[in-house]
Design a protein with these regions (language model features):
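G/A/S/T/P/Q/N-biased, glycine-rich low-complexity segments that form flexible N-terminal tails, linkers
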Residues: 1-7, 12, 26-29, 33, ...
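Glycine-rich, often proline-containing surface loops adjacent to acidic residues and nearby aromatics
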Residues: 2, 8, 62-69
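Compositionally biased, low-complexity repeat tracts
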Residues: 9, 39-40, 45-48, 52, ...
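N-terminal start-of-chain detector that recognizes signal peptides
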Residues: 11, 35-41, 86-92
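Catalytic cores and adjacent binding grooves of peptidoglycan-active enzymes
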Residues: 14-17, 56-62, 70-161
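Extended, low-complexity, intrinsically disordered C-terminal regulatory tails
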Residues: 17-57, 101-106
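A broad, low-specificity signal marking well-ordered, structured residues that form hydrophobic/aromatic
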Residues: 38, 66, 115
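Small-side-chain structural scaffolding
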Residues: 43, 65, 95-100, 178-179
């Protein structure tokens, strides 16, 4: 991509309908070399007291931040797609190296694939704009973890083979049934025919009754 072909604005109908600060555009210009398009959904706004429409964070004042989607070959990148994670990690880390200080993301923040990128106090965040809600993968990427060491998105319990699930089933699951079968194989729990050994039959019957 040449010039600013990598940059697209789709914020004409948004409250924050101003362009990004040239400094932020410069910090994100590496996207052209990666073949990535950045689509600005929410851009800059006037600062408080300047008379223009504005909403939310002061980070967006004068184009100091944008809420954006990233596209590769016409497809929106999404952290829920494992194949996209190395690209997104590279974007986050290169942006930070170029001076971008604030990055927000999360399925429960602005939806899958949408990022806040900009200047302001350094940090990452997720739902509600809170650092405590920043996804683990975003924290790791922001702090420089290699793509292969960044945790997978989501909080789903890792899949376990059926045998391991059974091993954790507890005394009332398959594990308990197995234990019962083991006990049943022990001699003291085997049924003795009264006619073949009357004394043994009575002893075992009494033992089980008192157990």
């Amino acid at each position: 991509m040449t010039g600013n072909d990598w940059l697209k604005y789709s914020n004409q109908g948004a409250t924050r309908n101003d362009p990004l600060d040239p400094a932020l555009i410069g910090a994100m210009s590496f996207l052209g070399d990666m073949g990535i398009t950045m689509d600005v959904i929410s851009g800059g706004q006037e600062a408080a007291g300047e008379g223009g429409a504005r909403t939310g964070s002061v980070r967006h004042d004068h184009g100091g931040a944008g809420d954006v989607d990233f596209y590769k070959d016409g497809r929106k990148l999404d952290w829920n797609n494992p194949a996209d994670m190395p690209i997104l990690v590279q974007i986050i880390q290169t942006a930070k190296a170029n001076g971008v200080t604030g990055i927000g993301a999360g399925d429960d923040y602005m939806g899958a694939g949408r990022f806040h990128v900009g200047f302001g106090n350094p940090g990452v965040w997720g739902a509600g704009g809170k650092g405590a809600n920043a996804p683990a993968w975003l924290v790791a990427a922001y702090n420089g973890a290699p793509a292969g060491k960044v945790p997978s998105p989501g909080n789903a319990t890792p899949w376990q083979p059926q045998g391991q699930q059974n091993a954790l089933a507890g005394p009332f699951g398959v594990q308990g049934q197995s234990a019962q079968n083991t006990l049943a194989q022990q001699p003291q729990f085997q049924w003795t025919d009264m006619r073949s050994d009357p004394a043994m039959f009575m002893n075992r019957r009494n033992s089980l009754a008192m157990g």
